[in-house]
From Swiss-Prot:
Its EC number is 3.4.21.-. It is an enzyme of class 3 (hydrolase). GO terms for biological process: proteolysis. The active site is at residues 87, 145, 239. It comes from Heliothis virescens (Tobacco budworm moth). This is Scolexin B. SMART domains: Tryp_SPc (SM00020). Belongs to the peptidase S1 family.
């Protein structure tokens, strides 16, 4: 996700029961058959009185998500490989990743250095260096926005705090598919990265809807939109984050957002680079 001016180096553009008391008279003469709750009513009562299960921390919902280079997200696809966005190399060297945590200040987080980066051979990006107002630019898009980063040593994957996402290989996805991502991007346009990982809930949109964005190309892109009631989106610093379905399969890499040269807003269309379109390239580079 890109901002309107080059000076925004620190944040990449892209690309949140009461149980009923008995009556006052506990001893009553029964003059008619008591009301026996139905099974459905009994189940409902049991659920109402059961203690609420607290939601999982965001990093346990997205154990494959990492902080890449301090200004982007990324996805663990093996103990030694991270998948992120090619444009994340424009403003940062991407020399390290942070994994296994919900907070960048956590001393128990796992850090690994990046020893090699491989950018997709067809990667290209729009004119992010131009003033968006002067040139009437709505959003800056990227094509084939993929980067593979090889780590200096393996991550200790445990399946709970750190896990490798499965790679999508499906040529098409059902419209309305529930998907999401975890990242550290800013909560407003031009802001700074957040220390707490946030989780976003979205749904896959049709190519017809996505094509309202003139730079959209279904060959290497897919787009999503936030689900109600929050209508989540993405903002500066969410670039590179992995879009996953409910089975933990990574289907996209966060690339750019509707009107991202000017603003971040709930309900915006978010464009991800389509992982299935580069499945063979990933295998060639990583043997995964």
């Amino acid at each position: 996700m890109f901002a309107s001016k080059l000076a925004v180096c620190s944040a990449l553009a892209l690309l949140a029961v009461a149980h009923a008391a008995p009556g006052g008279n506990d001893i009553q003469k029964i003059t008619k058959a008591p009301n026996v709750p139905t099974k459905a009513e009994g189940d409902a009562a049991s659920k109402a009185s059961a203690p609420a299960i607290p939601p999982k921390p965001v990093n346990e919902r997205f154990p494959h998500a990492v902080l890449f280079g301090g200004t982007c997200g990324g996805t663990i696809i093996s103990p030694t490989w991270i998948l992120t966005a090619g444009h994340c190399t424009l403003f940062t060297g991407g020399r390290y990743i942070l994994a296994g945590t919900n907070n960048t200040d956590n001393p128990n987080a796992v850090t690994r250095h990046v020893k090699r980066q491989v950018i997709h051979p067809l990667f290209s990006v729009g004119p992010y260096w131009l003033d968006a107002d002067d040139f009437n630019i709505k959003q800056v898009a990227a094509r084939w926005d993929f980067l593979l980063a090889e780590l200096s040593e393996p991550l200790p994957l445990d399946g709970k705090l750190m896990a490798a996402a499965k790679l999508d290989d499906q040529p098409s996805l059902p419209v309305g598919l529930n998907v999401g991502f975890g990242g550290y991007g800013t909560d407003h346009f031009g802001g700074t990265m957040r220390s707490e990982m946030h989780g976003m809930e979205l749904a896959v949109q049709s190519d017809e809807v996505c094509s309202t964005l003139e730079q959209y190309n279904s060959k290497d892109m897919l787009c999503v939109k936030g689900r109600p009631p929050r209508f989540d989106s993405a903002c500066n610093g969410d670039s590179g984050s992995g879009l996953v379905d409910e089975t933990g399969r990574v289907i996209g890499v966060a690339s750019w957002v509707e009107n991202d040269a000017h603003s971040c807003f709930n309900g915006a269309l978010v464009v991800f680079s389509r992982v299935a379109s580069v499945r063979d390239w990933i295998k060639k580079v990583t043997n995964i």
